[in-house]
Amino acid sequence: QCKKHLEEGKNIISLGLSKEDKSAIADLFLLTDKHILYVANVDEASMHTGNKYSAALIEAVKNEGNEVIVMTNAIEAQIAEFENPEDKAMFMEEYKMVEPALDRLIHSTYKLLNLSTYFTAGVQEVRAWTIEKGWKAPQAASVIHTDFEKGFIKAEVIAYDDFLKY
């Protein structure tokens, strides 16, 4: 089944294998069984709609469960140069951008890799930590230091919106 699919030029990920079938081919470490984040760099005129090449890419990978980010790298490079947030916001408004494509790229990457972020806050610093989605607090604490998981006592948790509100 996999061989035929590959010979047709298709990625294994689009085959929709069962867990049993996936474990049977796991030792092969097939790259086409991995999710892919495609990034299409388009010209400024196509930054909101894409172009024929990005449309063809989207069409080609639509059944794979992968994602395509369409962006204009020249504009993104200019956005990255701004130090003043107001200037950055004005520039983005001029191009009718809600957020930089780099932010979408980061969010899509986290989603694709099944990652999440949690924050720790102390007197001197606030820090972001990357963890796998679904981890419990003790596992998340192990990212800071392995001993933290072993001696874990409690976590004070607050939703982001509540944190901003209160």
Question: Locations of the language-model features?
Answer:
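C-terminal-of-GTPase-core extension/linker across diverse P-loop GTPases
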Residues: 1-166
